[in-house]
Curated annotation (Swiss-Prot):
Keywords (A to Z) from UniProt: Coiled coil, Cytoplasm, Nucleus, Phosphoprotein
Compartment(s): Cytoplasm; Nucleus
Modified residues (Phosphothreonine): T16
Organism: Macaca fascicularis (Crab-eating macaque)
Protein name: Coiled-coil domain-containing protein 89
Gene: CCDC89
Annotated region (Disordered), positions in chain: 1-38
Keyword Plastid: no
UniProt feature, compositional bias: Basic and acidic residues: 19-32
Highest rank taxon of the organism: Eukaryota
GO CC annotations, alphabetized: cytoplasm; nucleus
Subunit structure: Interacts with HEY1.
Length: 374
């Protein structure tokens, strides 16, 4: 029988344990493998002998002997190959272990070098610290001696000051007491003045509130009047819009009646003359109204100046006089002046509106005449 071919064993995995332990484990594995191989060889030889003994005389021919020799040689070749593979694996493992040991030796050498450098630096620092400590001890001794000298001099100076400046200090203390008494009296006067100022401020605030209330009432009346004027302005705008619409309608009718205008040319010329006379009369009226407006503006300016003077006089009299009757009289005067001012302002605005209406009507007439007589 041919012996089974031994399979090539896998290379052992690298262990992360230290190199000495791995080397011992590898040696143990190799020894165990050698013992197993020897036991296997002995078993194979025993099987071969048993096979030879069991053969018959006929089978023990030359051919059988050659076959057995060939098988034996093949087994020996396999054994030698396996041993050579094992030796090669051992060499590779030893080379790896040697490389790891060399790397560790280099690392340890670098660590030793760094540690030597660190110890050298520590020695240098220790020497500098020792020198600094000696200097500090010397400085401390010098400071103690100087401190003792300065204390002795300070005691001497204290004795001299107490003997020389005692009377002067007493005089200064008396002056300080006088000044403190005077300061207290002045603070009392200051408090009384503050109270008076507070009372005056309260009175002034009350008067100011009264004046503000009066001004607010006047402002309310003024706002009401302005709202009325705005409503009037709105109505005038509506009337103007209606007039514009009427003008648009008139223009439409004018386009439709363009043929009839030729027949009524004579009547239109007469109307033109009448309109011219009317425009002349209205121009004169406008000039008169403008003169009246100027007079009213002058009156307004005079009234404004009188109002300003009255307000100033009212403020002065309100500050000087505390009686309520005088304040009411002045307030009545101010109200009368304000009413006169408002009436004059309304009259001036009415005249201005009337003059503007006359001017707008004159412009409309001129526009109609231009359309009629291009």
């Amino acid at each position: 029988m041919r012996a089974p071919m031994p399979q090539k064993e896998q290379a052992p995995r690298m262990d992360t344990s230290p190199p000495e332990e791995r080397l011992e484990k590898q040696n143990e594995k190799l020894n165990n493998q050698e013992e197993e191989m020897e036991f296997k060889e002995l078993d194979d030889l025993r099987e071969a002998l048993a096979n030879l003994r069991g053969l018959s005389e006929e089978e023990r021919s030359e051919k059988a002997m050659l076959r057995s020799r060939i098988e034996d040689q093949s087994q020996l070749i396999c054994i030698l190959k396996r041993r050579s593979d094992e030796a090669l694996e051992r060499c590779q493992i030893l080379e790896l272990l040697n490389a790891e040991l060399e790397e560790k030796m280099m690392q340890e050498a670098e660590k030793l070098k760094a540690q030597g450098e660190y110890t050298r630096k520590l020695e240098e620092r220790f020497m500098t610290l020792a020198a600094n400590h000696e200097l500090m001890i010397r400085f401390k001794d010098e400071y103690k001696s100087e401190n003792i000298k300065l204390r002795e001099e300070n005691e001497k100076l204290k004795l001299e000051n107490s003997s020389l400046f005692s009377q002067a200090l007493k005089d200064e203390e008396a002056k300080v007491l006088q000044l403190t008494v005077r300061c207290e009296a002045l603070t009392g006067e200051l408090e009384t003045l503050k109270e008076r100022c507070a009372q005056d401020a309260c009175q002034a605030q009350a008067r100011e509130k009264e004046l503000l209330e009066l001004q607010s009432q006047q402002a309310c009346t003024h706002t009401k009047k302005t709202e009325q004027l705005r409503s009037q302005l709105q109505t005038l705008k509506q009337q103007h819009q209606q007039a514009v619409e009427q003008m648009a309608e008139a223009e439409e009718t004018h386009s439709s009646l363009s043929q009839e205008l030729q027949a009524r040319l004579q009547t239109v010329t007469r109307e033109k003359e009448e309109l011219l006379q009317l425009s002349m009369e209205r121009g004169k009226v406008l000039q008169n109204k403008q003169a009246e407006i100027r007079q009213l503006e002058e009156k307004l300016e005079i009234a404004n100046e009188g109002r300003k003077h009255a307000l100033e006089r009212f403020k002065q009299e309100a500050v000087a006089v505390d009686s309520n009757l005088r304040v009411r009289e002045l307030q009545c005067k101010v109200d009368g002046i304000q009413k006169a001012y408002d009436e004059l302002r309304l009259q001036s605005e009415a005249f201005k509106k009337h003059s503007l209406d006359l001017l707008s009507k004159e412009r409309e007439l001129n526009g109609k005449l231009r359309h009629l007589f291009p």
